[in-house]
UniProtKB/Swiss-Prot annotation:
The lineage of its organism: Bacteria, Pseudomonadati, Pseudomonadota, Alphaproteobacteria, Hyphomicrobiales. This protein binds to the 23S rRNA, and is important in its secondary structure. It is located near the subunit interface in the base of the L7/L12 stalk, and near the tRNA binding site of the peptidyltransferase center. This is Large ribosomal subunit protein uL6. SUPFAM superfamilies: Ribosomal protein L6. Transmembrane segments: none annotated. It comes from Rhizobium rhizogenes (strain K84 / ATCC BAA-868) (Agrobacterium radiobacter).
Amino acid sequence: MSRIGKKPVQVPAGITASVDGQKVTAKGPKGELFFVANDEIGLKLEDNAIVVTPLSNSKDARSKWGMSRTMIENILKGVKEGYERKLEINGVGYRAALQGKNLQLALGFSHDVVYEPPEGITIAVPKPTEIVVSGINKQQVGQVAAEIREYRGPEPYKGKGVKYAGERIVRKEGKKK
């Protein structure tokens, strides 16, 4: 029995949610998102809450039960509050700047890296060493942050590179003379 899946997802005030077969649509102040559940998952909207149930007792249905509930909860939070991921840049000469909507990164290569964000993602650069990725889709925000970090991930000797805010880098000791 899924402990996460058992709890109904409460629809917050200010959000309209609708269930149409396997599709849950949520509209809120930040935008509109939808989630299509697996055929083995049943969805019902009752008392301003979405109830998720497995239609069979198979292992596959039970494993997708909790995940479906969490995905619905994520789209409801996304259209109400949105998601953001902060990145930090460490290193001499490493910096970020916005060029229109595109992100321009100086990361020690012979050329600047230009990253074009996908539709629905907003990138802000409050300081040259800070990047804030925000949007309503949690998966997409995390994916964009991971792609930016991938250009120059933090290295273990000096900690130079792009890292998530609050990420702890395991440092290594250099060579002994």
